[in-house]
Each structure stands twice: as C-alpha cells, then as structure tokens.
Swiss-Prot record:
<dbReference type="Pfam" id="PF01439">
    <property type="entry name" value="Metallothio_2"/>
</dbReference>
<keyword id="KW-0479">Metal-binding</keyword>
<dbReference type="GO" id="GO:0046872">
    <property type="term" value="F:metal ion binding"/>
</dbReference>
<protein>
    <recommendedName>
        <fullName>Metallothionein-like protein 1</fullName>
    </recommendedName>
</protein>
<keyword id="KW-0480">Metal-thiolate cluster</keyword>
<dbReference type="InterPro" id="IPR000347">
    <property type="entry name" value="Metalthion_15p"/>
</dbReference>
<comment type="function">
    <text>Metallothioneins have a high content of cysteine residues that bind various heavy metals.</text>
</comment>
<comment type="similarity">
    <text>Belongs to the metallothionein superfamily. Type 15 family.</text>
</comment>
Amino acid sequence: MSGCNCGSSCNCGDSCKCNKRSSGLNYVEAETTETVILGVGPAKIQFEDAEMGVAAEDSGCKCGSSCTCDPCNCK
C-alpha cells in the first residue's frame, strides 16, 4: 500500500511522520558546515545547512508542512 496520494488531495498518507521522531522506516539526516574566512578584514563566519529526509513507504513522496507532499511526485 502506497502512503502517498496524488491529485487535489495530495498527502503523505498514514505513514506520514512529519516533525515526529519515529523508529522504523523513516530517518532524517542533517548536516551543518561552518566556514571561517580570515584575512585583512574582520572575521566572517558562514553557516550552511543541508537536510535530507527519506520515507521508504511513501514511494518517493517527501513530507512537507502539515503532512502534505512536497512535491507530490507519486509513482
């Protein structure tokens, strides 16, 4: 059973675990990179964030806000 429904009612289905910790098939990986540039001027610190989420039961459906698909790309 696919957890993603497409069309006007696109949502991530029963397996939607948006903004919740769950054990099982869903995982979220976050990476933060800090760059310090030193030179003639004052020190500048730059932060870059990258976040990746995968839900195995959602057929490539990525949960957005309010458990909606972002984008709705069900197959």
